């Protein structure tokens, strides 16, 4: 009964978060994120029973069919909604709270080869937009929004909005921090580096830089 209630809650979460959802049958049969979460429930139970090979086998089969990789050791709360889902990776020591929404291409990963706790903790009511990377043993507190393609390497307080590379807070407790910011103005480090090199080359042509190489 507990499992059935959880599955009903997961389906309800899909309808709340995705306006494209039309029917319960459609959600159950076609939503890969839902399939990945339900497969993880089985894999995680086996993992806790120290049946590691069976747990990993289920997680890998799920990844093959859904494109979503959730390590069986990860601890996931209620009503996790993974939308689109392709390319999502959730690491072994990651914990995720309740009512969390994750979009495609998100990585909740580590930063190196260290053992032990090495993945992020995600609080309740968190939204992580497409392509974002949350890395390391950090805490993303409750009611946080993380913008698309952001790279978050430090803990984030509750009621914050984070964007950019590296991620920085642009809104906290409903108040903007610094200048107005939206996804159209996300920093592009590659473009900035190219512009820097162009400026250096221009200085070389004008005789302002005499060295044979540019740093």
UniProtKB/Swiss-Prot annotation:
What are this entry's molecular-function GO terms?
serine O-acetyltransferase activity
**Pfam families named in the record:** Hexapep
Biological or metabolic pathway of the protein: Amino-acid biosynthesis; L-cysteine biosynthesis; L-cysteine from L-serine: step 1/2
According to its record, what are the GO cellular component terms? cytoplasm
Q: Which Gene3D superfamilies match?
A: Hexapeptide repeat proteins (2.160.10.10), serine acetyltransferase, domain 1 (1.10.3130.10)
Q: Which domain of life is it from?
A: Bacteria
EC? 2.3.1.30
Q: Where are the transmembrane segments?
A: none
Q: Share an example GO biological-process annotation for this protein.
A: cysteine biosynthetic process from serine
Family according to the record:
Belongs to the transferase hexapeptide repeat family.
Q: What is this protein called?
A: Serine acetyltransferase
The gene behind this protein is: cysE
